[in-house]
Design a protein with these regions (language model features):
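Amphipathic alpha-helical segments within well-ordered protein domains
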Residues: 31, 72-79
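Short alpha-helical hairpin
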Residues: 1-9
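Divalent metal-dependent phosphate-bond-processing catalytic cores, especially two-metal-ion Mg2+/Mn2+ enzymes
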Residues: 11-40, 53, 81, 98-190
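Short helix-capping segments at alpha-helix termini
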Residues: 79-85
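His-Asp-centered metal-binding catalytic motifs of divalent-metal-dependent phosphohydrolases/nucleases
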Residues: 42-62, 67-71, 75, 89-99, ...
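A short glycine-/small-residue-rich loop at the edge of a beta-strand within enzyme catalytic domains
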Residues: 21, 62, 66, 84
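Exposed alpha-helical structural elements
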Residues: 2, 46, 88, 92, ...
Length: 190
C-alpha cells in the first residue's frame, strides 16, 4: 500500500496500456512475489521501486526492447537510490524489456557485487510485469520464471477484472482486438 500511496505520478508513462493501472497491478504482483519468495524488507522495497518505475522510459506503446534502458538512466533520480541498490535497480529495469536470453548480459553490464540478488530482482520484476499481460489478453505462463508466479495466474485475471470494474473501464479495452489481430509473438521473447 505504501508503494502505491507514494507513487510519483508525474514520471509515469501516460497510456491505456502501460499507464497507472498497469503500474498499480504490477506493484500488487511484485508485493505478492516478495511475500511468496520471502524477500527481505530491503529487497521488497527494491522490487517495488522496480515495479513502480519500470516503464518510465516508454515513449510509445507496443513492442519496445529499449524502454527499459531509457528507464534505467533516470530511475536513480526518481527513486533516490544509490550504490549497489541503484546498480541492481538499473539492471532489473533494463532487463525487463529485453529478451530472456539477454538478461545475464544486461545484468553483467551493471556489475552488481551480488549477482544472485540482481538476478532475483530482475526475474521477479519480469514476472510481476508479465502477470499483467492479462490486460492485453496475452498472458502465457510459459514465460513466467517462478512457480509462485505461475500459481498466481488466476489471481492476475481476477485482479484485472476487479480493477477495471472499480475504476469504470472496459474489461476489453478498444485497442485489444486490433492488437490481437496483428500480433506475432512467436519467438519474440525467447
Amino acid at each position: 500500500v505504501h508503494a502505491v500511496e507514494h507513487l510519483n505520478l508525474d514520471v509515469l508513462y501516460e497510456s491505456k496500456i502501460h499507464g497507472l493501472g498497469h503500474i498499480e497491478r504490477t506493484l500488487c504482483h511484485g508485493g505478492m512475489s516478495a511475500m511468496d519468495e520471502h524477500l527481505s524488507e530491503a529487497d521488497t522495497s527494491l522490487l517495488l521501486d522496480a515495479c513502480a518505475y519500470h516503464d518510465i522510459g516508454r515513449s510509445r506503446d507496443g513492442l519496445d526492447f529499449e524502454h527499459g534502458s531509457v528507464a534505467a538512466r533516470f530511475i536513480g533520480l526518481v527513486t533516490g537510490r544509490t550504490g549497489e541498490d541503484l546498480l541492481i535497480l538499473k539492471a532489473a529495469v533494463e532487463a525487463h524489456s529485453r529478451k530472456e536470453k539477454e538478461m545475464q548480459s544486461v545484468l553483467d553490464k551493471y556489475h552488481p557485487s551480488d549477482m544472485a540478488r540482481a538476478k532475483n530482482i530482475a526475474q521477479l520484476l519480469k514476472d510481476a510485469d508479465g502477470l499483467d499481460r492479462v490486460r492485453i489478453c496475452d498472458l502465457d505462463e510459459n514465460f513466467l520464471r517462478r512457480e509462485s508466479s505461475v500459481h498466481r495466474e488466476p489471481f492476475a485475471h481476477q485482479l484485472y477484472i476487479r480493477y477495471q470494474t472499480v475504476v469504470g473501464l472496459p474489461l476489453v479495452p478498444d485497442f485489444v482486438p486490433e492488437m490481437l489481430k496483428h500480433r506475432n509473438r512467436e519467438k519474440v521473447w525467447l
